């Protein structure tokens, strides 16, 4: 059993990779990619994917018997009020109180979060007994405010949702890591396996990726690549990288070198 676990609220995860469920061609591929990733958590947009109506095709059916944790998210919500209502209804229908809080401020271009509405919703939901994983911008001050409001994990974007641009501000990932005590989960903008590895090397506790897997030419293969990248990045972070220096440093010893 791996002793280096990801702890969020009262739940413990062996995997530090979280996957999404959107943009796949069908539920079967979603399931197969998730299994290949060995992720133990999958996000589901409550407003866009049926998880509450048993009469319609249901993503939950594909994961029956698995230990994968469903993480309902509020994608599509733009205010604290509608988000709070959505999650309360979701909990009533499914019993799930482990949630990804996502409130979008710009719905047309950047899909950037509305951090003020997010902060308001976080405080209410946390007091209402939810375990809140809060999607936000890469601002260490807001990250700390969300933690103070009761968030059990902070999920700063690496780049705009679905952009595949990778981590645009590496320093802010480090600053957020230093500012909070709850897990930091890099979310949005991951485009390939190396992006996930870099996020972990910077100190992220986990990575969430959806589009990079779902829209890859081979989603199953990309899912396994993400799995390995997150593991490698975490090991690299724990091992401790060498310091960067402006000049060369010989890797072979010079003492006792033969002279000719």
Swiss-Prot record:
GO terms for cellular component: cytoplasm. Pathway: Cofactor biosynthesis; thiamine diphosphate biosynthesis. It is found in: Cytoplasm. InterPro entries: Aldolase_TIM, Thiazole_synthase_ThiG, ThiG. 1-deoxy-D-xylulose 5-phosphate binds at residues 162, 188-189, 210-211. One of its GO terms (biological process) is thiamine diphosphate biosynthetic process. The active site is at residue 100. Its EC number is 2.8.1.10. GO terms for molecular function: thiazole synthase activity. Keywords: Cytoplasm, Schiff base, Thiamine biosynthesis, Transferase. Pfam families: ThiG. It catalyses: [ThiS sulfur-carrier protein]-C-terminal-Gly-aminoethanethioate + 2-iminoacetate + 1-deoxy-D-xylulose 5-phosphate = [ThiS sulfur-carrier protein]-C-terminal Gly-Gly + 2-[(2R,5Z)-2-carboxy-4-methylthiazol-5(2H)-ylidene]ethyl phosphate + 2 H2O + H(+). Homotetramer. Forms heterodimers with either ThiH or ThiS. HAMAP family: ThiG. Belongs to the ThiG family. Catalyzes the rearrangement of 1-deoxy-D-xylulose 5-phosphate (DXP) to produce the thiazole phosphate moiety of thiamine. Sulfur is provided by the thiocarboxylate moiety of the carrier protein ThiS. In vitro, sulfur can be provided by H(2)S. This is Thiazole synthase.
